[in-house]
Amino acid sequence: MHLKEYAACAAAISMFATAGFAQEVTLRFQHFVSPASANPTYFMQPWADAIEEQSNGRIKVELYPFMQLGGSAPNQFDLIRDGAIDGGWVIPAYQPNRFPEAEALELPFMTSKSGEEASAAAWDYTQTYLMDDFADVHVIAAHMHGPGIVHKRGPAIETLEDFEGLKLRGPSRPATMLLEALGATPIGMPVPQFPEALSKGVVDGGVITWEMSPSLKLDELTDSHTDVAGDQALYNLYFIWAMNKDVYEGMPDDLRAIIDANSGMMASMWAGRAHDTGDAVGRDLMAAAGNEIATLSEAETARIAAVGAEVTQAWIAEMNDKGFDGAALVAAAQAAVADNLMQ
């Protein structure tokens, strides 16, 4: 073989190899909780497995818990936007005032206690009110968790007055507004900081879901767990599962279609359902540990809901001052919730 022929052959082989391997994509997704908690167990890992299976192995999704790739939970959105990671789990509330329209879904007694139903509402609401806010990333799913529960040292909450003076961790601005209105001292912090804050006495307890209680060792760090009566959650929290926009748009069409097939309403409800599954497990584990499991009376729940309504009105006024139509946002969130009730 002449040198020129050899070079041409080698170049052709190289081009073929490059073309072949160019179709293989590894996506690094990051989150900030234990891999044993509900969302990674029942949504993230099955979602990653589905992507790999449907692509015949051409897409591999690697999941990194506990922010192992760097950064912190509050700046996860920016890590995705800037390409430091390919994708991840974002709680917009961890950056207060940056995504204010998302807070409508987090207001007191806004959603049902079904994470799946609430997540369907979240996806619908997101399409109308939040896609411009998230234009710098590619949103795969928008979802909520199950009902927020009050976990604390000492006896369970029985009356509204029992909140007075308690130092309670809150995950979002609406949640901390509610805790303050109830008489507690709210301390905002991301979930990874909660166990240490409990163990050091920085907080007396906090509000979070049942499903997070095992991985946070709340069976050891708290004594009681209190929910409100009825079908509506005390509060909820909004999440997105998102990709770097350039990474998504740079994928071959057929592989991007696989991401699309596992996105949207289906993926959002899947993520919410993961929290429902985890909530049942977490509640049972707290009960098995001997902790006190309590539900407020309907009368006390009504008193707390009345305080929650005042918080919602205060939020509407704040949004109006920022140039939004706060009442319209609340009405839209309520409509999305009502439209997605499954019963």
Give the residues covered by each predicted segment:
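Core domains of carbohydrate- and sulfate-ester-processing enzymes
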Residues: 121-122
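Sec/Tat signal peptide C-region and signal peptidase I cleavage site
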Residues: 16-22
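Absolute protein N-terminus
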Residues: 1, 22-23
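Bacterial N-terminal signal peptides that target proteins for export
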Residues: 1-8
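Hydrophobic helical h-region of N-terminal Sec-dependent signal peptides
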Residues: 8-16
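Basic phosphate/pyrophosphate-binding loop/patch that engages nucleotide-derived ligands
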Residues: 126
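N-terminal secretory/targeting leader peptides
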Residues: 9, 23-116, 129-343
